[in-house]
UniProtKB/Swiss-Prot annotation:
Gene3D superfamilies: Anticodon-binding domain, Bira Bifunctional Protein, Domain 2, S15/NS1, RNA-binding. The lineage of its organism: Eukaryota, Metazoa, Chordata, Craniata, Vertebrata. NCBIfam families: hisS (TIGR00442). GO terms for biological process: histidyl-tRNA aminoacylation. Catalyzes the ATP-dependent ligation of histidine to the 3'-end of its cognate tRNA, via the formation of an aminoacyl-adenylate intermediate (His-AMP). Plays a role in axon guidance. It is an enzyme of class 6 (ligase). Keywords: Acetylation, Aminoacyl-tRNA synthetase, ATP-binding, Cytoplasm, Ligase, Nucleotide-binding, Phosphoprotein, Protein biosynthesis. One of its GO terms (molecular function) is protein homodimerization activity. Belongs to the class-II aminoacyl-tRNA synthetase family. The keyword Transcription does not apply. The modification N-acetylalanine is found at A2. Homodimer. It holds the Pfam family WHEP-TRS. This is Histidine--tRNA ligase, cytoplasmic.
């Protein structure tokens, strides 16, 4: 017991140490190192407790989904998939884990969030961090130079999640990408159109899509005097401007990353600007940026992009924002990110902040990193942050107390008298064979009232009632659960009548 008490004291002291580091705003690396020590101590403490103290729960950053939550999820996925297919995308899938070497060096400072799998004496493996790098690997492996694809799957990040804000360690991404050599900005404009179509269809609130270009960022850093070696690390600091103030970002640049204060101030003059095509034209005349080749190329492409966005009718939802940086290393051109302008809530409630709900950009060099000959395949794409969208939809449903159906059952096969199980089984089988979504209660002689109550609770719209008289007459009594109206339908016409009432097309199964 003395050893256990000593271990508990070590856990307490280490926990206090970690909290102190966070209050002092120590570096992320230092905090992570001390958190790792704390977790090891806790694991040791857990082993001492034995199996009888095991707490049944899901791992940190993960969750189970109830039938109600899955019904919401399926509706969201359906909206997204229909949009992807409307734009001509094919679907692919890739392994949930990749060779560690495949993922290494693609994510900048976020590489520390990759989950490495324990070495089993073979290949070094990691869980996928996103769907973009595996897609680039897939293109290079299969020597593909042209494809429009979508992919919906889980990804994994060793993050400190805020699950109430839709942030997890295991979560879905819904990606759409266009690979191939095309005229400038046409595929990029379509990706932004898709993003706007999906977010509008989901009706989760007003949103704004911020756009920028990595070439403009790099040109801006160059003219401000940022050393080449610090471009990516300063970029990751700028990327935090949607979460913290400019002063905090500046302090990080100067205090942690060694940037001269006057250089940081010059960056601040640029990154606090946002607007439309007029800002693009203004920056093309900027005395410093206009002398930088990369910046001029990026601004020229953005000007063309805005022309296409006007034609697509979505320019009112787009803002050129010089603070948008997107920390991932593989972006090479246009980048974009959608954020909610407001979160609809009940009066008096705090808005639910969920951060970015969709993002993407151009990554022309990523495939070349995997190709043996370094052949590049230009790519542009987007990713929908569905977990955050689920958080918004769930909160909205809870606030409205709206009933969510968790099944698609169209009709319950019921009986009004006893000893009709065989007839119910025959009828439900006929309905299944005809493609009708049907159920029956698993009792030989269920009470009619119980069967009707089940329909009301499950949201089943129709009841097909069998009785002795109906069997003699060759009819089925079809009851509407909502109106309680009943009509006799000839058995051979029942399938068509159910389809008509539930607006179901002819089954293709």
């Amino acid at each position: 017991m003395a050893d256990r008490a000593a271990l508990e004291e070590l856990v307490r002291l280490q926990g206090a140490h970690v909290r102190g580091l966070k209050e002092q705003k120590a570096s992320a690396e230092q905090i992570e190192e001390e958190v790792t020590k704390l977790l090891k101590l806790k694991a040791q403490l857990g082993q001492d407790e034995g199996k009888q103290k095991f707490v049944l729960k899901t791992p940190k950053g993960t969750r189970d989904y109830s039938p109600r939550q899955m019904a919401v999820r399926e509706k969201v996925f359906d909206v997204i998939i229909r949009c992807f297919k409307r734009h001509g995308a094919e679907v692919i899938d890739t392994p949930v884990f990749e060779l560690k070497e495949t993922l290494t060096g693609k994510y900048g400072e976020d590489s520390k969030l990759i989950y490495d799998l324990k070495d089993q004496g073979g290949e070094l493996l990691s869980l996928r961090y996103d769907l973009t790098v595996p897609f680039a690997r897939y293109l290079a492996m299969n020597k593909l130079t042209n494809i429009k694809r979508y992919h919906i799957a889980k990804v994994y990040r060793r993050d400190n999640p805020a699950m109430t804000r839709g942030r997890y360690r295991e979560f879905y991404q819904c990606d759409f990408d266009i690979a191939g050599q095309f005229d400038p900005m046409i595929p990029d404009a379509e990706c932004l159109k898709i993003m706007c179509e999906i977010l509008s269809s989901l009706q989760i609130g007003n949103f704004l899509v911020k756009v920028n270009d990595r070439r403009i960022l790099d040109g801006m850093f160059a003219v401000c005097g940022v050393p080449d070696s610090k471009f990516r690390t300063i970029c990751s600091s700028v990327d935090k401007l949607d979460k913290v103030s400019w002063e905090e970002v500046k302090n990080e640049m100067v205090g942690e990353k060694g940037l001269a204060p006057e250089v940081a101030d010059r960056i601040g003059d640029y990154v606090q600007q946002h607007g439309g095509v007029s800002l693009v034209e203004q920056l093309l005349q900027d005395p410093k940026l206009s002398q930088n080749k990369q910046a001029v190329e990026g601004l020229g492409d953005l000007k063309l992009l805005f022309e296409y966005l006007i034609l697509f009718g979505i320019d009112d939802k787009i803002s050129f924002d010089l603070s948008l940086a997107r920390g991932l290393d593989y972006y090479t051109g246009v980048i974009y990110e959608a954020v909610l302008l407001q979160m609809p809530t009940q009066a008096g409630e705090e808005p639910l902040g969920v951060g970015s709900i969709a993002a993407g950009g151009r990554y022309d060099g990523l495939v070349g990193m995997f190709d043996p000959k370094g052949r590049k395949v230009p790519c542009v794409g987007l990713s929908i942050g569905v977990e955050r969208i689920f958080s918004i939809v769930e909160q909205r449903l809870e606030a409205s107390e709206e009933k969510v159906r968790t099944t698609e059952t169209q009709v319950l096969v019921a009986s009004a008298q006893k000893k009709l199980l065989e007839e119910r089984l025959k009828l439900v089988s006929e309905l299944w064979d005809a493609g009708i979504k049907a159920e029956l209660l698993y009792k030989k002689n269920p009470k009619l009232l119980n069967q009707l109550q089940y329909c009301e609770e499950a949201g089943i719209p129709l009841v097909a009632i069998i009785g002795e008289q109906e069997l003699k007459d060759g009819v089925i009594k079809l009851r509407s659960v909502a109106s309680r109206e009943e009509v006799d339908v000839r058995r051979e016409d029942l399938v068509e009548e159910i389809r008509r009432r539930t607006n179901q097309p002819l089954s293709t199964c």
